[in-house]
């Protein structure tokens, strides 16, 4: 049983359209408990800066570092050509999955279609 959750948060930009709802999500998670009553640790994972593509059907791309994926011994993390934020996200996620081989991929092409690797993988239990 896992007692760690991810949640994304806009990097303290109160003017960002996602700020309010992500702050509310964080507040809700503060009181979350497991079925055994144990407190859940909430790991903050910052959102990348907004990615907008002119004349695209999505005015703002749904970019998120939480769209990572575990495959065998690998850890695939999307990047968004935001050097500082990409590095911070990699550090946070890699700490949670020690010993896995890190592989990054440019997530922009994926999120232009509405999701990234995790979204399109169709996870199936064995």
Regions found by a protein language model. Name each.
Residues 1-5:
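Short, small-residue-biased leader/transition segments that mark boundaries at the very start
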Residues 6-126:
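The feature marks the mature, well-folded catalytic cores of soluble enzymes
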